[in-house]
UniProtKB/Swiss-Prot annotation:
EC number: 6.1.1.14
Protein name per UniProt: Glycine--tRNA ligase beta subunit
GO cellular component: a single term: cytosol
InterPro entries membership: DALR_anticod-bd, Gly-tRNA-synth_bsu, Gly-tRNA-synth_heterodimer
Assembly notes: Tetramer of two alpha and two beta subunits.
GO terms (BP aspect): arginyl-tRNA aminoacylation; glycyl-tRNA aminoacylation
Keywords, comma-separated and alphabetical: Aminoacyl-tRNA synthetase, ATP-binding, Cytoplasm, Ligase, Nucleotide-binding, Protein biosynthesis
Family: Belongs to the class-II aminoacyl-tRNA synthetase family.
Length: 688
């Protein structure tokens, strides 16, 4: 069995594209081999900033022999038909077989093909993969018509120790490559993957991104510990830097003290966004005046010149940040509000100033429902977007809200207002903390609900995988705010209030928006609770009742329904419900009528139907009492008492009695089972 080694050596591949590219290369070549019937033991791909590598082990020297049969014309067919068949198969009449198929005697061609050499297939598949490679962005270079993410320098392609002459544009594969751009740029020849890996290491290249990541993290943590500090965790930055270096060398640098009065978030964001530096923290969690840079160089002076150069660049960056910070604080947030009228929120939904007016009013509405101070909530919402016109947020949009908090405190606003400004975008994802302070919750809800109502009202709803306005995230944020804070919030009422704050002519009515949004929340709630093992069909079964817009109450009902269905009584009653519903549906269709209302007690002949009617009456009262107190577990327990009388009814009573009045009465009794159970959930939506 043989090995295939492929290296595509180019200018620097953007870090964000590397992992996907390695997966795509492995997948495309593997699929191409499979289509040609060539199997192998393992395929692994690697990527560095300058090289995309694939190694496939356990390959045969040739593909399998193939035997193919083609049926031709009848033996009695004219010569013209025979000529076409012979031409398509490349055979003579003497080489054909004659077979009686039962429908006549036909010619058959049995074509035996030797398996193609694997090297030939590898060349074809590799060139095809490169020609159709799905880079998010690619370019042409020189006089070439081909495209690649960055100009290709060389291609290395070896199969069983021999060169596979892969050609792509001006590059034709050989057995040569080069090491680190600065530390070992000389070309060298390789024999196989083991030789390649060893020589790359000697040439200052760590091929495996997992190894580079580990080296960066371990080195950075070691330097931090030596300073008595901790490395600020940042998986995104770690992944990006891993894709920027082939030979990582962590170094520690210093931040000038004059910058340390700038908010830590600004310093961290500036270092991360512009310089790809890791921040270091003191034992109390505050930012230390140190940073870690990952160099791609080993130097004779131990990195002193590299550190000095990076500190010089950082001073310029942080000088800009400090200037923005000082400049922004000279103008109060409230004075910035008129500028929001110059910013469009969305063409059909007005300006950011319009949105601020709406969320301020809505935050006041919500505050009264959740026990927050209405005036404080309205004030916080009024200032929540003001930092969008500041210099720092213009430079670092990810700091919006957070900088508003700093500026609000600088202006003398209360901590409650400042905290609500900072938190009003939260939670932005499953890893983001959820606001708990009542005012912060009111403003965060108002901001998200306003967006959902507006976009749904103009039919800009998420479709499939497309969600350009992050409305799914907004809905999940609302769900978390409500559930994690235990808010008894009537969402329908809030949606109608939000619709009323829009001055624009919206396409859909408030009622349509409320209905669409409640269904949207049901779908998002199912997604949010899936990780907790809550079945989506149970959520649908409760929502389908209609009128349930209290998410806390809905969750209690779902939990009670789940526990009920997990019980023996619940599982068996569900079977009986389906049986009853099926019978009623069939008979209603047959009679062209609806069996509703109460069964006539005077027409109950058998003990089992009398017992069922009595049980339905008792259970109905018990369910009513439980629903008043929202004791849904008790309501389900009451429902469970129907199991035995329902089972006895089906065992002993003939529903389709010969006497028409008895038949109708018994069908009404079955319909009453559905009605009784339907007060707690739409059991027709329950799966399984």
């Amino acid at each position: 069995m043989a090995e295939f080694l492929l290296e595509i050596f180019s200018e620097e591949i953007p870090a964000r594209m590397q992992a996907r590219a390695a997966d795509d290369l492995r997948g495309m070549v593997s699929d191409g081999l499979a289509k040609n019937g060539i199997t192998f033991d393992a395929a692994r791909s690697y990527v560095t900033p300058r090289r995309l590598v694939l190694v496939i082990e356990g390959l045969p020297l040739a593909g399998p022999d193939v035997s193919e049969e083609k049926r031709g014309p009848r033996v009695s067919s004219p010569a013209q038909a025979m000529e076409g068949f012979l031409k398509s198969t490349g055979m003579t009449v003497e080489q054909l077989e004659q077979r009686d198929t039962g429908k006549g005697v036909f010619y058959f061609a049995v074509i035996n093909r030797k398996g193609r050499p694997t090297a030939e297939v590898l060349r074809e598949v590799t060139e095809g993969a490169m020609a159709t490679f799905p880079w998010p962005k690619s370019q042409r270079w020189g006089a070439n018509s081909i495209r690649w993410v960055r100009p290709i320098q060389s291609i290395l392609a070896l199969f069983d120790g021999s060169i596979v002459p892969v050609a792509f544009g001006p590059a034709t594969a050989g057995d040569m490559t080069a090491g680190h751009r600065f530390l070992a740029p000389e070309p060298f020849r390789v024999k196989d993957f083991a030789d390649y890996l060893s020589k790359l290491r000697h040439a200052k290249v760590m091929l495996d991104p997992v190894e580079r990541r580990h080296a960066i993290l371990a080195g950075a943590e070691g330097l931090a510990a030596a300073e008595g500090l901790q490395l600020k965790a940042d998986d995104g930055l770690l992944a990006e830097v891993t894709g920027l270096v082939e030979w990582p060398v962590p170094l520690v640098g210093s931040i000038d003290d004059k910058f340390m009065d700038v908010p830590a978030e600004v310093l961290i964001t500036s270092m991360r966004a512009h310089q790809k530096y890791f921040s270091l923290l003191k034992a109390d969690g505050s930012l230390a005046p140190r940073f870690i840079v990952i160099s791609n160089m080993e130097t004779d002076d131990g990195g002193k010149a590299v550190v000095a150069g990076n500190q010089r660049v950082l001073r310029a960056r942080l000088s800009d940040a400090k200037f923005f910070w000082d400049t922004d604080r000279k103008q109060r947030l409230e004075a910035r509000l008129p500028k929001l009228a110059e910013r469009t929120f969305y063409a059909s939904l007005g300006t950011v100033a319009d949105k601020v007016d709406r969320i301020s009013a809505l935050a006041g509405n919500i505050a009264g429902m959740i026990g927050a101070d209405r005036a404080v909530a309205e004030r916080a919402a009024r200032l929540a977007k003001a930092d969008l016109s500041t210099e720092l947020v213009g430079e670092f949009p990810e700091l919006q809200g957070l900088m508003g908090r700093y500026y609000a405190l600088n202006d003398g606003e209360t901590p409650e207002v400042a905290d609500a400004i900072a938190a009003h975008y939260s939670p932005q994802g499953p890893g983001d903390s959820c606001p708990t302070a009542p005012v912060s919750v009111a403003v965060a809800l108002a901001d998200k609900i306003d967006s959902l109502v507006g976009f749904f009202a103009i039919n800009e709803k998420p479709t499939g995988s497309k969600d350009p306005f992050a409305l799914r995230r907004a809905a999940l944020g609302i769900i978390r705010l409500v559930l994690e804070n235990g808010l008894r919030l009537p969402l329908s009422q809030v949606i109608f209030l939000a619709s009323g704050h829009y001055k624009a002519n919206l396409v859909n009515s408030p009622g349509e928006v409320a209905n669409d949004l409640l269904n949207f929340f049901a779908d998002r709630l199912a997604v949010a609770l899936k990780e907790k093992g809550v079945r989506h069909d149970l959520i649908t079964a409760i929502f389908s009742l209609g009128g349930e817009d209290d998410l806390v109450r809905l969750l209690k009902r779902v939990e009670a329904l789940g526990a009920f269905l997990d019980s023996d009584d619940g599982a068996n009653l569900l079977i009986a419900y389906r049986r009853a519903a099926n019978i009623v549906r069939i008979e209603e269709k047959k009679d062209g009528t609806i069996f509703s209302g109460y069964a006539d007690i005077q027409l109950l002949r058998q003990d089992e139907e009398k017992a069922l009617e009595h049980a339905l009456s008792d259970v109905g009262q018990a369910v009513s009492n439980a629903l008043v107190t929202e004791d849904f577990a008790a309501a389900m327990a009451a429902l469970a008492r129907l199991r035995r009388p329902v089972d006895a009814f089906f065992d002993k009573v003939t529903v389709n009695a010969d006497e028409a009045p008895l038949r109708v009465n018994r069908l009404k009794l079955l319909a009453m089972i559905g009605s009784a159970m339907g007060r707690l959930a739409d059991f027709s939506k329950v799966e399984g």
